From Swiss-Prot:
Region listing for Disordered, in residue ranges: 330-350
GO molecular function per UniProt: N-acetylneuraminate 9-O-acetyltransferase activity
Protein name: N-acetylneuraminate (7)9-O-acetyltransferase
Glycosylated sites: 139, 185, 239, 654
Stored InterPro entries: Cas1_AcylTrans_dom, NXPE4_C, SGNH_hydro_sf
Length: 781
């Protein structure tokens, strides 16, 4: 009865909320959000530098998140490179001196705070000069120093960081006359600061709050009320300058949350001072170094030649899409299946496809690529950095697994690793990887090591699936190869052109493509051994095992010959495909990390198909895979193996050391046995996970730009100020886009890859010319 009610309820929901309706809702949300953010940028503050300097919040201990953009954590080498041949002056009181020390420690962490309290402090590092000038009050002495810089009689700094107020409050006991004099003195230097701002960067540091409870008697008059009055005076006076002196307010906001940790109530704890220093460094250097994880103070990058050509093609496609109209969209496609929400497969031959179909598909793909560009290249949407907490990873993990169990259904097949089960496997792994990426869980080594197993499991499935196909069907035709390569690479090739990223940037697709080529070569080259050939002959089975052993030795040889490996892949045109930032090292690292996973998948497929052929497995519904004794034994060993691996991974302290062990330690086989030995487990699958499994490749690639941001370094912000709602909305749009791209890829594959040899060879020749042209243009770029 409960099952009937569940099925009726599911049918009722799908009648009103089909996949098509979900996509229409997602498209409407994209349009509204784009208009909202574009209008906010146009009519409001569109400068991310203003956001960086003015506001933010703590994500966790000492992790500062500016409003709407990402803060890059500068290393010493980066800071030195950015500030080479620059003169920087910190002007003010003891609080500015603290900021000065935090700033120069980013250039040289070994610096000690040993300068005299009320004197100037010089700092020279190579050809960079950073000086602290002691001016505790805004007075004539300060005005004279600023005048020297404007008149050119003293070397003018490239950057001036200035601020003072607490001494004025202290010396005049917080009297109102002192505030009036402070305003007058600020007015007197406002024009001078304006002139300096014409050729230098000038920052006025707003006063941080104090912790009144622990202030000494001599500082009791420095209250937060007084601090606020002096800050208001500074803003109202200096805001009138045409060049608009920049206000550093972010450190003040950070101090509001941490001032209670102050020892004397006046000076900030070092971690809070570091926030102000890092904000300043981002403001000065992001536009120079353009770090991908530092989106503050960066404008949209200029279009490359390839991007301009891609934009022209996509624009023509969009025009065709609009002209054809939505009414003619896939007339031959039947209505969606109410039960599953998926469109039913049309039985018509490929040759009967409506010629408008490919144009409509390309038009939709063009609009989707426009959304990708707006999300992660144009200066429209906000971005925030990741911050790992255990709850951010494990709570969503528990939630999706509860959903997965809730949507358990009887599988149509009960064979080991049947299609529904492999889709389920890919689905839950992909969801875990998505949560892993958005939560920044790579910072937690035990989670990182478990996710490494999931990536290896994808490659294991690659070996298992393609070996099984070639072994059973013996189809080594060009059509099959082109179909696989097109489905794997179509989205990535388009993204490389639109997002101006190298092929290796989307590392998983090059990895899977490479291993598919290896599997194909292993199975297709002489001696070509197939199941029908090996039937009844142990010799051919042994020959295939020797072939796999040869592949294993080949892999081992390259794994221990890094120079040879890098030498081969550094030759053009392979270098253009596998290099990242001019180096082949990333490809070497990715390849080496899971080098045995594909061979393990091939070997497992061979052994399984052999056992199946000789009827040594019980794959009936509800039956254990082996006899009860063997099944229980294998289950026990598998569970112990799983637990042992988890304990080992939890004890990992160093990523590089654990990565060295990773290729030799695998629990993939243990998982397969646990999932398949019990008959009841093999008879069920999660339709929830299986649905995501069918679009797992698209989900993995699309996350780079429309769910995460800054090429996976940050998080896309569609709904500012509400992280939970933002994740819900961006995830909904992201999944709908991935599903649509999957359908577009499948549709275009039928048209782009004809079965006839003649047309197929012509298109391959065209694809080759296109590839050479793209590689040549990218080299010139």
């Amino acid at each position: 009865m409960a099952v009937l009610a569940y099925n009726l309820g599911k049918r009722e929901i799908n009648q009103y909320f089909s996949i098509k309706n979900a996509k229409l809702l997602a498209a409407a949300a994209v349009v509204l959000l784009t208009v909202f953010h574009a209008a906010s940028r146009h009519y409001g503050s569109s400068d991310t530098c203003d956001w960086l300097l003015s506001s933010g919040r703590f994500l966790g201990d000492n992790v500062w998140q500016p409003y709407g953009c990402m803060l890059h954590k500068y290393k010493s080498t980066e800071a030195k490179f950015c500030l080479r041949e620059k003169r920087i002056a910190f002007v003010g009181d003891s609080r500015i001196r603290q900021l000065f020390y935090s700033f120069i420690k980013m250039m040289n962490p070994e610096v000690k705070e040993v300068g005299n309290k009320h004197e100037n402090i010089p700092f020279v590092d190579g050809d960079s000069t950073v000086n602290f000038l002691w001016y505790a009050e805004v007075n004539n002495s300060l005005k004279e120093q600023l005048m020297l810089w404007t008149e050119g009689s003293a070397s003018k700094p490239h950057v001036i960081i200035i601020g003072a107020a607490t001494w004025s409050i202290k010396l005049h006991n917080g009297k109102s006359e002192a505030l009036f004099q402070y305003k007058a003195n600020l007015t007197a230097i406002a024009d001078t600061l304006e002139k300096l701002a014409e050729h230098s960067e000038v920052y006025w540091v707003l006063q941080d709050p104090v912790y009144e409870d622990v202030l000494s008697e001599s500082r009791k008059m420095i209250t937060n009320e007084q601090i606020n009055l002096y800050n208001e005076a500074a803003v109202s006076t200096l805001n009138t300058s045409k060049k608009k002196v920049k206000f550093l307010e972010a450190s003040r906001q950070a101090a509001m949350e941490t001032i209670s940790q102050s020892v004397d109530g006046l000076h900030l704890p070092e971690s809070t001072r570091d926030v102000g220093a890092m904000v300043l460094m981002n403001s000065m250097c992001n536009k120079i170094l353009k770090p991908i994880d530092g989106s503050c103070c960066q404008s949209a990058p200029p279009l490359s030649v390839l991007q301009k050509l891609a934009a022209a093609v996509l624009l023509v496609s969009v025009v065709c899409f609009v002209l054809l109209g939505f009414s003619s969209h896939r007339k031959s496609r039947p209505a969606p299946d109410v039960e599953s929400g998926e469109e039913k497969k049309h039985p018509a031959a490929v040759g009967q496809l409506n010629p408008k179909g490919p144009l409509l598909a390309i038009g939709k793909m063009s609009l989707i690529m426009l959304y990708f560009y707006l999300c992660d290249r144009a200066d429209i949407f906000m971005k925030e950095q990741k911050f790992y907490t255990h709850s951010a990873f494990f709570i969503p993990l528990i939630y999706i697994f509860v959903l997965g169990v809730f949507y358990s259904e009887n599988s149509k097949e009960t064979k080991l690793l049947n299609r529904e089960q492999t889709d389920e496997w890919k689905g839950w792994m992909q969801l875990v990887i998505l949560i892993y990426h958005i939560s920044g869980a790579s910072a937690f080594i035990p989670v990182y090591m478990h996710v490494r197993v999931l990536v290896a499991a994808y490659l294991f499935q690659t070996g298992y699936g393609h070996f099984s196909f070639f072994w059973l069907k013996g189809d080594f035709g060009l059509y099959r190869v082109c179909q696989v390569l097109f489905r794997l690479n179509f989205l990535v090739v388009v993204l490389c052109l639109v997002m101006d990223r190298p092929y290796q940037f989307y590392y998983f697709v090059p990895l899977v493509t490479f291993w598919f080529a290896v599997i194909y070569a292993t199975m297709a080259l002489w001696p070509q051994i197939l199941q029908k050939q090996a039937n009844g002959s142990a010799f051919w089975n042994l020959a295939l095992l020797l072939k796999l052993l040869g592949l294993l030795l080949f892999i081992g040889f390259f794994a221990y010959s890094q120079e040879l490996f890098e030498g081969i892949f550094s030759v053009w045109p392979l270098s253009k495909l596998f290099e990242l930032q001019g180096s082949i090292h990333e490809w070497w690292f990715r390849w080496k990390l899971d080098r045995f996973a594909v061979v393990n998948g091939m070997l497992f497929a061979f052994i399984y198909l052999l056992l199946q052929k000789y009827q040594l497995l019980s794959e009936g519904k509800g039956e254990p895979l082996f006899s009860n004794k063997i099944s229980n034994c294998l289950l026990f060993v598998s569970v112990v193996s799983f637990m042992t691996y988890s304990i080992w991974a939890s004890g990992c302290k160093n990523k590089s050391e654990c990565n060295e062990m990773h290729p030799y330690i695998s629990v993939i086989l243990a998982f397969i046995l646990i999932r398949n030995i019990p008959g009841y487990a093999r008879s069920l699958y999660s339709s929830f996970f299986a649905w995501f499994g069918k679009i797992s490749l698209e989900l993995f690639i699309c996350q780079y730009h429309i769910w995460l941001a800054a090429d996976t370094k940050g998080i896309l912000v569609l709904i500012p100020g509400n992280p939970t709602l933002n994740i819900i909305v961006s995830t909904f749009i992201f999944v709908c886009v991935a599903h649509e791209i999957s359908q577009i890829t499948n549709d275009l594959a039928q048209v782009a890859i004809p079965k006839e040899s003649g047309p197929l060879l012509k298109r391959l020749l065209g694809a080759g010319v296109f590839l050479v042209l793209v590689l040549t243009l990218s080299q010139k770029d």
